[in-house]
């Protein structure tokens, strides 16, 4: 396989040329939203220039909008491994889509039926189910997270499942600590008791190939702005389930899960983001492993991205573990790195995550601090009263030089920790 050409990748992202006080910006904020390649920017601009009209009309720009809508649904279906574009529904963001469809899903449930959520999940895959359960008189059971390695406690899952379980809501990967859950196994156990599975793949989508059929997901949601696109929510639903569920709309129609006029410019950008990822796969193709279609190109591209990112993450983890008073929360054993994304959740003995993030930001290094709406997890780890964690998120446009710069900056901040703490 050809070596991963990160320099060519970086040339596609205009934001990577930004500077802060004379130094290049280094973006480790990807889990909160990635930068976008030039083709995504161009696609959004081109839509407004050449196609700006509502859909369904008998004139040029409206027909072009129709084409964008159809092509975006098809491309996002390829990204997720859906059987048909009809299984893809688009909305403002993952949270809004989940809130919307949760009402449809729970409408078929009876009081006393049960929903299972987890303590490892983002609130977007917890809160909507709690609200729907309160409205319908449902019982909510919670799968625990193991504090030692911050993975799901599957024994707790087995205890939560029962004859009245109707839905299991689980994340593919933790946006806070990077843990990858055994989604296929969780789905197998859920289906064994007759429950549907709703997967939050927001954090996983930019880092690895997603295949809804391989993991037997009944629903899966993600957001394009996390995989190098614009702000747009994406929902996959098994077609037979979607067609059977009631929907909450003024007048249900074929597009009943997509309320109001669509964000067509966002769909144009999401289409371009998918094509960008597929292009990486096409470049990675060899005569021994040719790429035959867009889905194959996406799998090849995201596989190459994962290999590169995890090599970079090993460099980051090695460096963090050498820093005194520093702890990585989550999977740290190198032989288990297949079960994590390149996202590090870090705490420090004598400095708050906020202080460290601000000090890094003053040097042009972007990170996040807090709980990232993984509220239950941060509480489970006992970190809610300590400001959560510093989150360092790698993406495929990061470099070894950027990682080294981050580590050097952290070493300086920690060495001067009394001054840093006083100044932030």
PLM features per residue range, with description:
Residues 1-424:
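Pyridoxal 5′-phosphate
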